[in-house]
């Protein structure tokens, strides 16, 4: 997808947004196409959502925040405002997140009809230049919001299919080509003050979520980052050394989780050298990045390896100025790939797996949430979560930037999340 460009003239900007809108909506439909109606309503755990709900909720976002601002617009179905509101308390009550799997109605076809109807209304307004500047900023946010749900649709259906006793595949694609991972090397940086974060949007022309702002200075100590993320083979060494059998390198809550949940290896692994993928069970590639780790597992591995997780400032310092290139949903592999064996540079900063950091998800100094209902988007979740950076094989490339902050609780395992090592230097 091409980036939004600040073209001259309000009407021309809206045409650019029209193209991005159509591309984004089409990708969601393509990702959902392999799902049967039964697949699309499964909710395998409270943290996940049915595919049908993702399709409807992203549509509700455009209808609720863009179309309903037009007094002439007629709501598709007023009852659906309750069903497909996620967490916007200022908008009204909502169906419980953990109960989304009971929504056998509306049907998948009705949800598709809903998407089509809203798309017609949105495209008419964008084509005719009938949205003011404020509405166009919400369109841009809605596109970014839908890209987030594209990744969640994939990770949620992967968990649902794995939870099915038959463990069917989402699709049947050829296995991605294996690459011999480069030798792990360290890239050292001296102590310095660095500036991280993004300029506030929409005051800035470049989109960024409110949790990425404001730009601010951070003292970063002398440290080194690994040139690539940790591989399956390296994580297997941790397992073979008894990593899941002793509390030694685990945080207290992490070890309690290992015991309570019976963790013995990353999610989707088995003991026979296989892993469950969106293409079904596959032989585990030893050179591919280890994924589906919780922060607890990533942290325990780093301690075992005599290292630590990078801070988000260290990660952003390394990623600033680096092109957003890698293995994303755009490549259609839908599985992490090994880094190419090269001698220089830091690899895999973008794509393949989200990288857990050692930074709690907290507001930056001077953080200000967006005004109105959209102020609920990020800020109210800034507790008991950790920052991840870089995107994954399920993230759209155009969604990412060096300042992007993802966040999940310490025990979350169903995302494409891995680990890059860091260490302090004297």
Model-predicted regions and their roles:
Residues 1-49, 53-121, 125, 133-140, ...:
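Disulfide-stabilized, aromatic/cysteine-rich ligand-recognition loop
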Residues 142, 146-148, 152, 156, ...:
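Functional-site microenvironments in short loops/helix caps that host divalent-cation chemistry
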């Amino acid at each position: 997808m091409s980036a939004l460009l600040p073209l001259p003239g309000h009407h021309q900007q809206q045409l650019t947004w029209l193209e991005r809108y159509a591309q984004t909506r089409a990708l969601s439909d393509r990702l959902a196409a392999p799902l049967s109606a039964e697949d699309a309503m499964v909710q395998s755990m409270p943290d996940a959502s049915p595919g049908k709900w993702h399709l409807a909720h992203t549509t509700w976002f455009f209808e609720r925040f863009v179309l309903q601002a037009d007094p002439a617009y007629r709501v598709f179905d007023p009852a659906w405002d309750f069903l497909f509101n996620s967490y916007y308390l200022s908008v009204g009550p909502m169906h419980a997140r953990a109960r989304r799997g009971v929504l056998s109605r509306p049907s998948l076809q009705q949800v598709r009809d809903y998407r089509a109807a809203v798309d017609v209304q949105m495209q008419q307004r964008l084509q005719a230049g009938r949205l003011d500047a404020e509405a166009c900023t919400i369109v841009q946010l809605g596109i970014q919001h839908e890209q987030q749900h594209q990744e969640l649709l994939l990770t949620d259906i992967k968990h649902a299919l794995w939870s099915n006793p038959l463990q069917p595949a989402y699709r049947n694609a050829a296995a991605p080509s294996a690459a011999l991972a480069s030798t792990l090397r360290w890239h050292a940086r001296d102590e310095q003050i660095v500036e991280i974060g993004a300029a506030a949007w929409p005051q800035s022309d470049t989109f960024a979520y409110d949790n990425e702002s404001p730009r601010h200075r951070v003292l970063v100590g002398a440290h080194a980052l690994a040139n690539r993320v940790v591989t399956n083979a390296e994580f297997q060494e941790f397992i073979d050394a008894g990593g899941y059998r002793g509390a030694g390198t685990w945080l207290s809550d992490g070890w309690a989780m290992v015991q309570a949940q019976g963790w013995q290896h990353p999610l989707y692994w088995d003991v026979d050298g296989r892993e469950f993928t969106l293409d079904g069970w596959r032989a585990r590639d030893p050179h591919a990045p280890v994924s589906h780790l919780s922060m607890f597992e990533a942290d325990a591995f780093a301690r075992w390896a005599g290292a630590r997780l990078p801070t988000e400032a260290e990660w952003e310092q390394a990623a600033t100025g680096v092109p957003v290139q890698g293995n994303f949903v755009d490549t259609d592999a839908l599985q992490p790939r090994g880094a190419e064996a090269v001698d220089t540079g830091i690899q895999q900063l973008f794509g393949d797996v989200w990288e857990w950091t050692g930074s709690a998800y907290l507001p930056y100094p001077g953080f200000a949430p967006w005004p109105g209902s959209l102020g609920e988007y990020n800020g109210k979740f800034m507790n008991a979560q950790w920052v991840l950076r870089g995107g994954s094989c399920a993230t759209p490339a155009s969604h990412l930037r060096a300042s992007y902050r993802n966040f999940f609780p310490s025990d979350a395992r169903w995302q494409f999340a891995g680990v890059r090592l860091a260490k302090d230097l004297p």
